[in-house]
Amino acid sequence: MNDLFSLAGKNILITGSAQGIGFLLATGLGKYGAQIIINDITAERAELAVEKLHQEGIQAVAAPFNVTHKHEIDAAVEHIEKDIGPIDVLVNNAGIQRRHPFTEFPEQEWNDVIAVNQTAVFLVSQAVTRHMVERKAGKVINICSMQSELGRDTITPYAASKGAVKMLTRGMCVELARHNIQVNGIAPGYFKTEMTKALVEDEAFTAWLCKRTPAARWGDPQELIGAAVFLSSKASDFVNGHLLFVDGGMLVAV
């Protein structure tokens, strides 16, 4: 049974993984035996994250590149495949958030959100899955959101990007499943992270969240690891095009 969830011998590339949820997933997946390929836009942050993983006894290497620049992505993926090893699992985690009322949202910030949260998923997935198709094996995990299904004030571009990633997940599944590639998404609910720090400190919002969520609390980021291990392992070999909500029941409550 343990082998069902083992990631020993697997190479997992996680975008935006030098900090935050990405680094948490890197640590969790690494403890199940995977070699983690840390990505960040800066080499310094990526190398620092690798050092931290090494201190935990986790195999890790750095692969710094900008997830919005196709030429950097293509070069980095070719380097990884040639010099590090085949990418068995890709986790599209990199993301940003910007907040403004819809009618005042700056066009450049809209473009930034779409570039990082949506277009980067397409570009990185395209580069990586070309190799997976050749091998007839691979897994892609797209980090989605509650906003893949629900809207919220001041973050319309974010919701638009995450809704698009949900449909990208399904479209990729339809095209890639025949090549033994599983493409799924994880949709976190409200977790205590750097990105949500302002909301966590907002007493009124926290009170609303606890009332709105059947579990009646914020999520602990550690609670995302199990979903990532499942979707990275052979336990999920016939799970495809699925969006796994880790949200304390929030989506199903009215």
Swiss-Prot record:
It catalyses: D-gluconate + NAD(+) = 5-dehydro-D-gluconate + NADH + H(+); D-gluconate + NADP(+) = 5-dehydro-D-gluconate + NADPH + H(+). It comes from the Bacteria. PROSITE patterns: ADH_SHORT. Pathway: Carbohydrate acid metabolism; L-idonate degradation. NADP(+) binds at residues 13-37. Substrate binds at residue 145. Induction: Is up-regulated by L-idonate (15-fold) and by 5-ketogluconate (80-fold). Seems to be catabolite repressed. Is probably under the control of the positive regulator IdnR. Is part of the idnDOTR operon. Keywords: Carbohydrate metabolism, NAD, NADP, Oxidoreductase. Gene3D superfamilies: NAD(P)-binding Rossmann-like Domain. InterPro entries: NAD(P)-bd_dom_sf, Sc_DH/Rdtase_CS, SDR_fam. The keyword Electron transport does not apply. Its EC number is 1.1.1.69. GO terms for biological process: L-idonate catabolic process. The keyword Metal-binding does not apply. GO terms for molecular function: gluconate 5-dehydrogenase activity; protein homodimerization activity. Belongs to the short-chain dehydrogenases/reductases (SDR) family. Catalyzes the reduction of 5-keto-D-gluconate to D-gluconate, using either NADH or NADPH. Is likely involved in an L-idonate degradation pathway that allows E.coli to utilize L-idonate as the sole carbon and energy source. Is also able to catalyze the reverse reaction in vitro, but the D-gluconate oxidation by the enzyme can only proceed with NAD. This is 5-keto-D-gluconate 5-reductase. It comes from Escherichia coli (strain K12). The lineage of its organism: Bacteria, Pseudomonadati, Pseudomonadota, Gammaproteobacteria, Enterobacterales.
